[in-house]
Amino acid sequence: MVEARARWTDQERFLGIATSGHAIVIDAATEKTANSPMELVLIGLCACTASDVVSILRKKREPFTSLEVRAQAERAPNPPSVYTEIKLIYRVGGKVSRKAVEDAVRLSKEKYCSVSAMLQKTAKITIAIEYFDE
């Protein structure tokens, strides 16, 4: 079982702690002293799919040198203002097979990334892949 908690610290800031014991500061207001809960959802999505892609490319022995996943998202105008559209942009460095990268991204989206699976219930997720040599 995974557990998490958020403890109010001040203003609209919280200290979030999960089963791993690591803590993060969360800012639920517009003060922007830390990431908001909805920003953390997007960061979680980026990290989830990135870890899948890295794992798959390593298993295929693809010589990638860097990977960054960015998310651009739109939210519904009315509460609870869920994400309705998310564009994931994968930026891959190195002399990698484009097919291998595309397969890894597809597998992450369709099979492995649990965050993506949850968000796809309310949001259309689209993909873009950018390649560059380092």
Predicted regions and their residues:
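Extended beta-strand/beta-hairpin segments
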Residues: M1-I43, V53-E134
